[in-house]
């Protein structure tokens, strides 16, 4: 197993992800090679909570253009983690 800091990159802060916190669901950008088992273990280790469910989404990079040059942003992976009832992640409390 990889280190938890290598699996979880940063939390997703958006209007939709902040709304999911009320349902005890937290969103993170994760490593594109990470699987659900590694994501679950990383969240449980870093935040000392019990994970009930992990859902992942592969987000394709967007096409970007500067003048005549066309490029792409990097592909990313997002994980939505559902915690056991009563568990909370403290860093998200103020959102």
Curated annotation (Swiss-Prot):
Protein keywords: Ribonucleoprotein, Ribosomal protein, RNA-binding, rRNA-binding
Coiled coil start-end: none
GO biological process, one term: translation
Recorded superkingdom: Bacteria
Signal peptide: none
Segments crossing the lipid bilayer: none
GO terms under cellular component: ribonucleoprotein complex; ribosome
Methyltransferase recorded as keyword: no
UniProt KW NAD keyword: no
Assigned protein family: Belongs to the universal ribosomal protein uL23 family.
PANTHER family reported in the protein's UniProt record: 60S RIBOSOMAL PROTEIN L23A
Function: One of the early assembly proteins it binds 23S rRNA. One of the proteins that surrounds the polypeptide exit tunnel on the outside of the ribosome. Forms the main docking site for trigger factor binding to the ribosome.
Name of the protein described by the UniProt record: Large ribosomal subunit protein uL23
Organism: Desulfitobacterium hafniense (strain Y51)
